[in-house]
Amino acid sequence: MNQDKLQMFVERYLELSSELHYKKGESGAFMQLGELLTNKGDYDTSTKHFYRAMKIAEETGDGDMKEAAKVNFGMANASMKMN
């Protein structure tokens, strides 16, 4: 599956999770979008998605997701500054 199609599916998953107030799904979708956008070199947008994932994980008490989002946020932010 190509990256654009995958991004479309993840964005739809985010919409559905939001409509259903499924916070764990929202944070997971933001993480996936961040990873996809990092791979495309869109570090500015990916850091925003990682930040959203981190905040939602913090709200829901999901420590593992919060830590993963922090790491990805830091890596994308560093990559953005290097380019």
Question: Language-model segments: which ranges?
Answer:
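TPR/Sel1-like alpha-solenoid repeat signature
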Residues: F9, E26-L37, H49, K66-A69, ...
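Short coil/turn linkers that connect adjacent helices within long alpha-helical scaffolds
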Residues: M1, L16-Y22, K40, I56-D64
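Conserved tryptophan-centered aromatic signature that marks the ligand-binding surface of SH3
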Residues: Y43
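C-terminal non-catalytic interaction modules
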Residues: T47-N83
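Alpha-helical solenoid scaffolds in eukaryotic proteins
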Residues: E11-R12, R52
